[in-house]
Amino acid sequence: MMFPSLLAPPAVYPNLLRPTPTLTLPQSIQTALSNHTSFLIEDLIRISRPAGFLPRAVPPPSMSPPTSESPNCMSETSDLARREGPNQTSISSNNSSPFLKFGVNAILSSSPRTESAQVLLPSAHPKPFTFPYFEGSFQPFIRSSYFPASSSVVPIPGTFSWPLVARGKPRRGMLRRAVFSDVQRKALEKMFQKQKYISKPDRKKLAGKLGLKDSQVKIWFQNRRMKWRNSKERELLSSGGCREQTLPTKFNPHPDLSDVSKKSSGEGEEEPLCPGNSPAHALPYQCPEHHLRLDTQLPSSPFNSSSASKPSDFSDSEEEGGEQEEEITVS
């Protein structure tokens, strides 16, 4: 080759003549992509975007001036810049004129949006985004103003603050099970034997004396009453009673069943005495012996005598009627 420097980029500006990534594909792959009908976002954006809006690589400005260069390279680069300058301005003017400001192509383009963003936020330098799926048109939405500046990728949805908004009243935490000492347990048991349902002043006084909370004493008495009621129910059911006797009612809001066994034994001893004391109010299921005695004494009562005399009266009347009939027939 006669002039190798015309095709190779100069050493001072290596990125000036470097082609964009979209133009590096072979011709066969480009035709296949253009003929391929796909509904992916990337394909639609690539198809609908004109050539003038393709992103171009802008060379970073070098801070140090060029020190060693030949006059031939400088003249060649200046000639190339002069040739490309009017072409690029004409293409950009032709492409920008038919497209509206709020059109699809203008929205999907990257150069106007990035320029406006740089004008509005000159101090904000967006960090490189690690996902290759988003192009330059989405960069304004993935800036530090929307996401934390410390993270270079999209944060996990759990890190946002909007799911942490209060969804009603906060749930009340469950109380841990209190561990009572032997002294506290004995004092509570002693008070429970005195009164099953402790009043609020006594409960507060007992809690302050034992160094406990009012709620702890209240819960202990509730649990103790439940155990006591279950044991008394078993005793009543075994002795032939019913469960309703242990439950509080309107007439007996605080049932005391501590002497259930004594009461049941006392009732058993008083059963033989019930016929002599109140025979008129005695019920058959309470005094069965008295009921049997009344049945045995029924024949000697005046009601029995009258009832016994009734069949004789009926027989006498029948005989008299028979005699009258005979007399009628004879006459």
UniProtKB/Swiss-Prot annotation:
Sorted alphabetically, which Pfam families does this protein's record hold?
A: Homeodomain (PF00046)
- Please give the chief subcellular localization of this protein: nucleus
Q: Which UniProt keywords apply?
A: Developmental protein, DNA-binding, Homeobox, Nucleus
Which spans does this entry mark as compositional bias, Low complexity? 299-314
- Molecular function GO labels: DNA binding; DNA-binding transcription factor activity, RNA polymerase II-specific
Cellular component GO terms, alphabetically?
A: nucleus
Which stretches are labeled DNA-binding?
A: 173-232
Superkingdom as given in the UniProt entry: Eukaryota
Keyword DNA-binding in record: yes
Q: Where is the composition biased (Basic and acidic residues)?
A: 256-266
Instruction: Tell me its family.
Output: Belongs to the H2.0 homeobox family.
Name of this protein: Homeobox protein DBX1
Species: Xenopus laevis (African clawed frog)
Q: Which gene encodes it?
A: dbx1
